[in-house]
Amino acid sequence: VAHESSLLLSGFTLISGPCVLEDAGLNLEVAREVQRLAGDRGLDVIFKASFDKANRSRPGAARGPGLEKGLRLLAEVGAATGLPLLTDVHEPGQCARA
């Protein structure tokens, strides 16, 4: 069964990470675990996390570290793991920075 499941996953890229960026230590812990799990299965992986969760439905809910700090946190994950990075943007003006 393990052999069959690895054949089914062949050629897939896993995009994974926390919903929103947390503190640097937790981001790195998640990235390394995702990298390990993907590597064990022969998958490529892209680390994805948001710097701003603008779609929160509860007023005052935590939204993330913001653009500048979030990009720094993502860069730290990339530098430490070598993983490609992905985030989402909510406004056209954020694209140049991201």
Regions found by a protein language model. Name each.
Residues 19, 35-39, 83:
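Long, contiguous binding/interaction regions
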Residues 1-4, 27-43:
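Short amphipathic alpha-helices and their capping/turn segments at secondary-structure boundaries
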Residues 1-15:
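N-terminal amphipathic alpha-helix/helix-capping segment at the start of soluble metabolic enzymes
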Residues 21-33, 65-72:
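Glycine-rich anion/phosphate-binding loops
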Residues 9-13, 41-45, 79-85:
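Short, well-ordered coil/turn segments that N-cap beta-strands
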Residues 13-16, 48-50:
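Short beta-strands and strand-loop turn motifs
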Residues 13, 19, 60:
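Short glycine- and Lys/Arg-enriched binding-loop motifs that mark or flank ligand-binding interfaces
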Residues 49-98:
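N-terminal active-site wall of soluble small-molecule enzyme domains
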